[in-house]
């Protein structure tokens, strides 16, 4: 989502609260819970899941392996649910022509760097750069080159913008900031 006026451009960045992340976390949780229940059923010799009789899966080695996969899956699933609840990667980009300042804010993981806040002067922006890598997994990323600081990505690598969309976005931003566009 973007909000623009004559002097300010604010672009909201979606973090980890995407539908695909919710789906993967849910599927992984259910699958790993199933694996753990099958492993536990084979250990106890009781039927905790009604799909099969417990005698069909021997605890050593199948039950141990399934329990291990279930526990590992629950750890990965809990990691995904934590990133979703913390909304890691979300934030905003604010370009203020009137004040001459660019502010980039992102939420990170809890701890010392939970809030990532970068502030630059607009006069230090050298260019807006588009990096294109074609192939099976095409990647188009928009960067802002800052004098003495390097490049700062403005779009996610998994955003999958079409060439026309990334060019449009780069052209509008470069025009707003009055800086050149570079393509790599």
Swiss-Prot record:
| Localization per record | Plastid, Chloroplast thylakoid membrane
Q: Which InterPro entries match?
A: PSI_Ycf4_assembly
- The principal localisation class reads plastid
Cellular component annotations (GO), alphabetically ordered: chloroplast thylakoid membrane; photosystem I
Question: Which regions span the lipid bilayer?
Answer: 19-39, 57-77
Set out the biological process GO terms recorded for this chain's protein.
photosynthesis
Pfam families given for it?
Answer: Ycf4
Indicate yes or no for the key word Ribonucleoprotein: no
What is the protein's membrane topology class? Multi-pass membrane protein
Q: Which family does it belong to?
A: Belongs to the Ycf4 family.
Which PANTHER family does the protein's record reference?
Answer: PHOTOSYSTEM I ASSEMBLY PROTEIN YCF4, PTHR33288
Q: What does this protein do?
A: Seems to be required for the assembly of the photosystem I complex.
By what name is this protein known? Photosystem I assembly protein Ycf4
